[in-house]
UniProtKB/Swiss-Prot annotation:
UniProt tissue specificity: Developmentally expressed in testicular germ cells. In adult testis, expression was detected in round and condensing spermatids, but not in meiotic pachytene spermatocytes. Not expressed in brain, ovary, kidney, liver or early embryonic cells.
Modified residues (Phosphothreonine): T168
Catalytic site: D134
Stated name of the protein: Testis-specific serine/threonine-protein kinase 3
Source organism per UniProt: Mus musculus
């Protein structure tokens, strides 16, 4: 592996992330003269569904996306032993999860600045006909004051001609919308909007809005609606946005366009 990357101009460094069928390592690119991240995917190590369905989708999608709030993919390589290497932009500030874990709840102004960028990234994706389907704090990376979305491993290109309804459960339970958890045919874009609500809640409260250790209890909590710790003093406008994002009825839940017009995001 190291020899293959070295021959392509990459000096491998430490592991910075690990997924089910992949790991991400830091590397130095002689070609770009900068540090990069390399996602290493072992085609031999994954199940058939992953290799046949999810991996080709991810590779197709990351080739086409180009937005300042989405991690850029510079190059794709494949070695003879069945490993795929995605050479990507490195976000050196870690992810939102670690930021909140180490520093506690974010001030509302900082959460707003980051969340605005997530809205822009998802607005761009949905405009390109792509649903991310695995939005969570760990997939929102930080580079200074900038937020950059990563990991399109569960992403899907939606058919243009008709409204897409999916029954596939993707992503993490804690960030999954009620209709996704229940296996009801759903609009994946509305699922992304729900997940964004969970991300914003975690940014502001440093805790999850619903207990993900018990799915039936979690579904009941989701239907009951979200509540906020009073000591954090979250503004009324922000609470209103969170309630809309975490609307259990997917028909009533706003689209990403509608989210982008919300007064909380418009105010400085």
């Amino acid at each position: 592996m190291e020899d293959f990357l070295l021959s392509n101009g990459y000096q491998l460094g430490k592991t910075i992330g690990e997924g089910t069928y992949s790991k991400v390592k830091e590397a130095f690119s002689k070609k770009h003269q900068r540090k990069v991240a390399i996602k290493i995917i072992d085609k031999m190590g994954g199940p058939e569904e992953f290799i046949q369905r999810f991996l080709p989708r991810e590779l197709q999608i990351v080739r086409t996306l180009d937005h300042k709030n989405i991690i850029q993919v510079y190059e794709m390589l494949e070695s003879a032993d069945g490993k795929i290497y995605l050479v990507m932009e490195l976000a050196e500030g870690g992810d939102v999860f670690d930021c909140v874990l180490n520093g506690g709840p974010l001030p509302e102004s900082r959460a707003k600045a980051l969340f605005r960028q997530m809205v822009e990234a998802i607005r761009y994706c949905h405009g390109c006909g792509v649903a991310h389907r695995d939005l969570k704090c760990e997939n929102a990376l930080l580079q200074g004051f900038n937020l950059k979305l990563t990991d399109f491993g569960f992403a899907k290109v939606l058919p243009k001609s008709r409204r897409e309804l999916s029954q596939t459960f993707c992503g993490s339970t804690a960030y999954a919308a009620p209709e996704v958890l229940q296996g009801i045919p759903h609009d994946s874009k509305k699922g992304d909007v729900w997940s964004m609500g969970v991300v914003l809640y975690v940014m502001l409260c440093a805790s999850l809005p619903f207990d993900d250790t018990d799915i039936p209890k979690m579904l009941w909590q989701q239907q009951k609606g979200v509540s906020f710790p009073t000591h954090l003093g979250i503004s009324t406008e922000c609470q209103d946005l969170l309630k809309r994002l975490l609307e259990p009825d997917m028909i009533l839940r706003p689209s990403i366009e509608e989210v982008s017009w919300h007064p909380w995001l418009a105010s400085t």
